[in-house]
């Protein structure tokens, strides 16, 4: 009995810590732009894409992103804008609708 309980506890712990894949993520009801504003500049490099994916995960209640994939797509999408405080550094940013050339297909998030 104790062995089955231990196996069950391990399975539950693993399930809680394993990454979650979010297909076609949406924020504010819209697809999410692959780019993010960092330091006041639209950044579509790996850094900007990582920031946008991380913010998607946070919006879904996860701690951070592990991986992501996007595809080219024209139209309007939700775009993440980092905000900074002179004393505190980066503070909570905001989401805004903007024209986009690519949106996320999926994001893998971790707790």
Regions found by a protein language model. Name each.
Residues 15-111:
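Secreted/extracellular ectodomain signature
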Residues 3, 14-15:
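Intrinsic disorder/low-complexity segments
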